[in-house]
Amino acid sequence: MKIFCSRANPTTGSVEWLEEDEHYDYHQEIARSSYADMLHDKDRNVKYYQGIRAAVSRVKDRGQKALVLDIGTGTGLLSMMAVTAGADFCYAIEVFKPMADAAVKIVEKNGFSDKIKVINKHSTEVTVGPEGDMPCRANILVTELFDTELIGEGALPSYEHAHRHLVEENCEAVPHRATVYAQLVESGRMWSWNKLFPIHVQTSLGEQVIVPPVDVESCPGAPSVCDIQLNQVSPADFTVLSDVLPMFSIDFSKQVSSSAACHSRRFEPLTSGRAQVVLSWWDIEMDPEGKIKCTMAPFWAHSDPEEMQWRDHWMQCVYFLPQEEPVVQGSALYLVAHHDDYCVWYSLQRTSPEKNERVRQMRPVCDCQAHLLWNRPRFGEINDQDRTDRYVQALRTVLKPDSVCLCVSDGSLLSVLAHHLGVEQVFTVESSAASHKLLRKIFKANHLEDKINIIEKRPELLTNEDLQGRKVSLLLGEPFFTTSLLPWHNLYFWYVRTAVDQHLGPGAMVMPQAASLHAVVVEFRDLWRIRSPCGDCEGFDVHIMDDMIKRALDFRESREAEPHPLWEYPCRSLSEPWQILTFDFQQPVPLQPLCAEGTVELRRPGQSHAAVLWMEYHLTPECTLSTGLLEPADPEGGCCWNPHCKQAVYFFSPAPDPRALLGGPRTVSYAVEFHPDTGDIIMEFRHADTPD
């Protein structure tokens, strides 16, 4: 059955009605899931298998039947491990119906249907009794309910319910225990993801400083965790202020509480500095003795950094203290971890928490609007002084004292730069109430509330009255729009430029003057795993899962790129970067499609996993800003990516076999089309079997 769905087009700005298959959201969830990544996580799978074997043995040694409850079974992998280890029966719970259906097929294909019952329910809906889903309580609890924050997927309420209703008292649990660790650091780079710094503007009248409003400075920030591949943050980007501190542990074999709690650790700072950021991760022990351990520790805290398992479904956490605080080497402090049923946050206390009534504080929430409008990469981008200097340099070449400037970007400070550089009149368009409110506060904090005109409406709806009867001599954009997911979605600026054409005066300038779409073929060190078939996992056939993911990708996304922040995912360029399409912002959006096709030669040996695409914005003929590669690749092909933007990754299909020799295809063919009527960029990249 087909259904109609409305969708806001991020490129054209229009709302469209699309005919979709009724299961399109299932396909999308599967295509973008981490199932493949988990199946490729060898360390996780081996440790779970070892822990399950040990738990089944302990139960059998007591002369009991081994009855397993597997919550969040996914493919059924852990249940199949349990049966292979000697479990008498497994109840495998999976709430996501397409996944539960796949688990039934995988279990059947591997010959375990007589000992594994897949139950398509949330675990809190499972019943026990003669007429229930389970005839009796289980005595082994196996789960994989964890996310990067450990408890963010509802592990605590699920465990709490399971112990009360589904498993025996003092049951065996795999994992047996989890421990959360934290380390206090000073980091200007990471702090710039959470706070608005003063921005310096060099003008003919000297340096001007754009200061943040007081409530933005004092705001604790967004409540959500910042999860990243912490191993890709250079040690030069932070100063360690504390040892690694075990903050709290959860024993999963006993009753678990989802109630809010706090846990403190006394420590003495290793050096004096500014406490800004808490780095955090966890480990899980699969057995009561703690001999079978799976850790998310970054390389500097890992027991064997040379043998670390790469994974993307579990990473590390960055937490921001509400305010930076000075710390003195050797002067004792208390780091406090707070959590409710789904979230963790941290605070720093000068006195023992038992003596401090403030310690049981509420979860921090943004009350300044900035953290609701700007995500963490956007904060970093706005705080990038070099980037600001590039805009100032470009603006100087196009501004005149009598310029009338219209700025179009979400929550951008370009209007302030234009004013400080001497523009006669500046208008900025903010289509959302949140960005309008935030910019008004920033303007007031800098005494500009009467100098810059904010227009709260969609730019396509501008009237002569909005512009006070003036014609625009400079249309200005970063461009940046909060609805953009892929690099070319910011081509919305081009559609705005077309819509406001009637308001542009003779000889009006547009900045950026143009944009171009670029690409490079790469070999990923690890990211390829998220789209690579698994086939066999610890001796179990999971081809059905591979096929399910492939069908989901073929349904919608096989010919689409997906956004990834590639500074977190090292890769080597195998080709030279090349320009695919150009977009002339000096002219309105054309009526006819823009097309490009050709082949590119691979210059370096390697497994070509994907084509990476990004936009470059040509502010002026002499000044270009890249959202992708920032400099030429090093001799080995190493890439340096813009850390504030996500790049578009088009994975080749079929994925290269990692066991294959490196003498694969030496060319890649491509065909790319930009369709002005929809704003879509349709693309296809594929290996070409060209002989050497």
UniProtKB/Swiss-Prot annotation:
GO terms under cellular component: cytosol; fibrillar center; nucleoplasm; nucleus
Active-site residues from the entry: 144, 153
GO MF annotation list: histone binding; histone H4 methyltransferase activity; histone H4R3 methyltransferase activity; histone methyltransferase activity; protein-arginine N-methyltransferase activity; protein-arginine omega-N monomethyltransferase activity; protein-arginine omega-N symmetric methyltransferase activity; ribonucleoprotein complex binding
Keywords: Chromatin regulator, Cytoplasm, Differentiation, Disease variant, Dwarfism, Intellectual disability, Methylation, Methyltransferase, Nucleus, Repeat, S-adenosyl-L-methionine, Transcription, Transcription regulation, Transferase
Modification Omega-N-methylarginine, positions: 32
Compartments where located: Cytoplasm, Cytosol; Nucleus
Keyword Methyltransferase attached: yes
EC number in record: 2.1.1.321
Protein's UniProt keywords contain Cytoplasm: yes
Single Gene Ontology BP annotation: spliceosomal snRNP assembly
Chief subcellular location: cytoplasm
Highest taxon above the source species: Eukaryota
Entries under InterPro entries matching the protein: Arg_MeTrfase, MeTrfase_PRMT7, PRMT_dom, SAM-dependent_MTases_sf
Gene3D superfamilies on file: Hnrnp arginine n-methyltransferase1 (2.70.160.11), Vaccinia Virus protein VP39 (3.40.50.150)
Catalysed reaction equations from the record: L-arginyl-[protein] + S-adenosyl-L-methionine = N(omega)-methyl-L-arginyl-[protein] + S-adenosyl-L-homocysteine + H(+)
Domain SAM-dependent MTase PRMT-type residues, every copy: 14-345, 358-684
Class of the enzyme per the UniProt entry, highest EC level: transferase
Other comment: May be involved in etoposide-induced cytotoxicity, a chemotherapeutic agent frequently used for testicular cancer and small-cell lung cancer that can cause cytotoxicity in the treatment of other cancers. Down-regulation confers increased sensitivity to the Top1 inhibitor camptothecin (CPT).
Annotated family: Belongs to the class I-like SAM-binding methyltransferase superfamily. Protein arginine N-methyltransferase family. PRMT7 subfamily.
Task performed by this protein: Arginine methyltransferase that can both catalyze the formation of omega-N monomethylarginine (MMA) and symmetrical dimethylarginine (sDMA), with a preference for the formation of MMA. Specifically mediates the symmetrical dimethylation of arginine residues in the small nuclear ribonucleoproteins Sm D1 (SNRPD1) and Sm D3 (SNRPD3); such methylation being required for the assembly and biogenesis of snRNP core particles. Specifically mediates the symmetric dimethylation of histone H4 'Arg-3' to form H4R3me2s.
Subunit structure: Homodimer and heterodimer. Interacts with CTCFL. Interacts with PRMT5 and SNRPD3.
Disorder this protein is connected to according to its UniProt record: Short stature, brachydactyly, impaired intellectual developmental, and seizures: An autosomal recessive disease characterized by developmental delay, learning disabilities, mild intellectual disability, delayed speech, and skeletal abnormalities. Skeletal features include short stature, brachydactyly, and short metacarpals and metatarsals.
Name of the protein in its database record: Protein arginine N-methyltransferase 7
